Amino acid sequence: MAKRVVSPNPMLSLETENIAKMGTLTADSLGSMWNVFTKCAENLENGRRLENISWRLWYREAMMSDANDACQIACQESSVPDLSSSCDSINSTVESDAGHVVDSNSFNRIDNVSVNAPIVNEVSLQAPMKGGSHSSIVRPQAKRSSSRLLSTDAFSQFISSFSPPEKPSMKDLALFHGNKSPSSKETIPKVSNSNSSDTSTDDQAYLNVSVSENEHADRSIKTHSSAPPLNQQKSSTSVNDAVSKAIQLVKSTSDLGSLSTNTSSTAQKNKSRKPTKSFSDAVAAASRAKELEKEKLSKVTVTPDDSTSIIRGFDPRLPVLSTKNVSHEEKSHSVQDDKSKQLLKPNPTQPYFYLRGSFDTGHSASSSICSAAVDSESVNSADFPHRTVYDPLPTHAIAESISQENVIEDDDDDDDAWVSVDEAESPHFTKRSPAPYLSKSFRNSALSLLLSQDEKLQHDVRSASSAALNLPRDTDIKATPNLSQSGNINSDNSDLSNYPYNDYRVYRMSHCSSNSNKVLASEISESLRRDLLWERRQKAAMNSAVLRRQSSQSSGANDDKEVRNRKVVEKGFANDCSVW
C-alpha cells in the first residue's frame, strides 16, 4: 500500500475561478472534486474545508433526487442516480498518466494522487417496496467505494500551481539547529547494515544524521527519521555503531600519520587504511573543528584583574562594558557630567518652581514658593546661558508669602494671574500645576490681569497688604516700582524679597514676554465677540418673551406670566453679564 506523504507546507493551490467555471452539478466534476479534495486534503490550501464541502456535494448528488423525478420512480426500481460518466472504465493511457500527475525530480513523486480505480458495482435496495403509494418510498441506501476514478483532464482543470514536496526531516533539522552556523554542520550519508534491512525504502531515504562541533565532544549523534519507534531504534543503533567505528579508524590513521610524516611509503599505507573518502572527510572536518575550538578555549585566561567569564549562550553582538583602570581626571569629568545630568533630571521628592502656585490646601506652601530652586553656587549662568535661574527666597520672604496666602483669601485677583510666558526665555522650572486656567477661562487672561492691577492701584490694595505683612518701616510703598509702567525690569537687579511673591513676581514675568501685545489684541477681540453673542442672546430672549406675552394676552392669561417672564429675562441678563 502506498504511503501518504505529509509535507509541512501545502503543495497544491487551487483557484476558485477554475472551480466555478467547471460544471459543479455534473457527476463527473463532483467525483473528481471529491477525489482530489479527500486524497490531497493535507497537501492543499484549506484542504480540510474543501474536503468537507466536497463530501457534502457528493452526498447530495448520490443520495438525493428532485421531487418531480421521485414521484415517477417505480417501486421496484433499485438504483442510485446516474453516475455512469464517472463509473465507466478509462483507457490504459489515462490510467498510466494518472499515476504521475507531475513529472519532476526523482523525489517529487506524489503517491496520494495516484488512485486505484475499481469500477463501482451496482447496489440494490435491501427493503423492497410493498405498495404503490408514494408515501412508502424509501431513499436509496448506497454503499459507495472510498476511491473513484480521476482523469488528468479533470485534475488539471482546478489545480493552478504545484510545488514539489519537501523532506520533513531536513526542515525539522534546520529548525532544530537554526542557532548554529551552517559551516559547523556535516551531513553523513546513510550506512547500510543487516540489522536495518527490514526498514522501508522511503524511511531510509529520509534518514539524516547531523554531527556538529559541540556534539562531537560528548560522542552523541542525533538521528532524525520518519520510521516507527521500533525501526528507529534499530536504525539509530546501527548508525551509531558505524560512526563510532569510523571515528576510531580516523583516530588510528591520524596517529599513524603523525608518527610517519617524513616517509612517502608510510603515507601511502595510511591512505590505503582509510575508509571511503566521503565518510572519512566528514568526520575529519568535524574533529578539526573540535580541535580549533579547544585551542580557542585554552587561549582564554581568566584573571582577577580582567573580569571575563565564559557564559553559555553569550552573544558577541551585544556591547560589553569594559572594566579598565580610569584616570583621576576622567573620573572627575564623569562625576561633573553626572552632577549636571542630575541637576537637569527632575527629582520627585523635591517640589519645583511653579509659574503660578496651585492654590490647594495641601500644596500651597510647596507650590507657590520657589523652595526647590537650584542653588546659585552649584549652577552658573555660563553653564546654562539659555535659562534664567532665580535665586531662592529668604526665610522671612517665605513666611511673608505664607502669611499673605492666609490673610488675602477673599481676593480673586490672585487666582486670575495666569499669563503665558515667552518660549525663548522660559523660566527654570520642570512642571506646572495641572492647567488651572481651564476652570475659569474667561477670568484668567492678560486683559483681566491689567484690569485687576488698575483696580488695585485705584483702591489702594497695596497699603492693606503691606500692613498685613508687617513690612519694615523704612520701606515705603510708593518707592516700589510701578510694574504696569516699567515693563523691562531686569530680574537680576531687582530684589525679590521686597515684593509679595504671589502678587508681583508673576505680573513682572508676564510683562517680560514679547508677545504680550498680540495676546491682548486677541483677548480684546474675543471679548468683543462675546459681547455680540450676549446681545444676540438677549434679543432672542426678548423676542421670545414678547411673543409669549402676546399669546398670553390673546388667550386672556393673568399678569403673573408677564412678571414671571420679566424675572427670567433679568436673571439671564445677570448671569451673562459676568464676562470679565
Swiss-Prot record:
GO terms for biological process: cellular response to heat; mitochondria-nucleus signaling pathway; negative regulation of transcription by RNA polymerase II; regulation of nitrogen utilization. Residues 223-241, 256-269, 481-495 have a biased composition (Polar residues). GO terms for cellular component: cytoplasm; cytosol. Pfam families: GATA_AreA. Transmembrane segments: none annotated. Residues 326-341 have a biased composition (Basic and acidic residues). Residues 161-241, 256-281, 325-345, 472-495, 544-564 are annotated as: Disordered. This is Uncharacterized protein C1420.01c.
